[in-house]
């Protein structure tokens, strides 16, 4: 799993990861942190966390304009690529549409399945992002509490 936010701040991601573990899957989660002391690997309730240091600008501002600014994707491609070169995975599971490009890149480069799990309502972005209007994604989830 790849999450552009800090963890365990997102309860939905935690519940999903724990459900996958309960079903017999090994779950790794690559996520951002703004605190140097949290950088590195940790086991959290069976979830193998891989935290990478982000800057406040990248974390708060760049993701707003990520569809226009390539350095946001470059940062995440580097992090995902580093993890995929050291670990073996069958699937890359991206949380939220802004990182869909990174998931598609990993699918092509590393030959793994790509799951996009959108926790937010991004209908206005669906027309803009070719990754959601094609067969480039193997599975697309959208889980909203309310519509």
Regions from the PLM with identified roles:
Residues 1-48:
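N-terminal subdomain of nucleotide-sugar transferases
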Residues 10, 37, 73, 89-126:
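An aromatic- and histidine-rich active-site surface loop
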Residues 44-49, 110-111, 132-135:
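Short, hinge-like loop/turn segments at secondary-structure boundaries
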Residues 50-78, 133-139:
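A short, charged, and often flexible helix/loop element on the N-terminal side
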Residues 58-60, 123-128:
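Short acidic/His/Gly/Ser-rich catalytic and metal-binding motifs that mark active-site loops
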Residues 78-82, 105-109, 122, 136-147:
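Membrane-proximal helix-turn-helix segments that form the acceptor-binding/catalytic region
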Residues 83-89:
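Glycine-rich phosphate-binding loop signature in dinucleotide/nucleotide-binding domains
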């Amino acid at each position: 799993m790849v999450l552009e936010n800090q963890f365990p701040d997102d309860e939905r991601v935690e519940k999903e990861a724990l459900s996958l573990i309960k079903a017999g899957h090994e779950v790794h989660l690559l996520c951002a942190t703004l605190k140097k002391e949290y950088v590195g690997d940790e086991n959290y309730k069976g979830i193998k966390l891989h935290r990478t240091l982000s800057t406040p600008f990248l974390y708060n501002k760049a993701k707003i304009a990520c569809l226009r600014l390539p350095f946001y994707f470059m940062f995440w491609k580097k992090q995902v690529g580093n993890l995929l070169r050291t670990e073996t995975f069958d699937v890359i599971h991206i949380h939220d549409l802004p990182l869909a490009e990174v998931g598609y890149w990993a699918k092509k480069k590393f030959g793994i399945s790509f799951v996009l799990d959108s926790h937010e309502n991004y209908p206005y972005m669906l027309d803009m992002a070719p990754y959601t209007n094609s067969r480039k994604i193997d599975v697309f989830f959208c889980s909203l509490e309310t519509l």
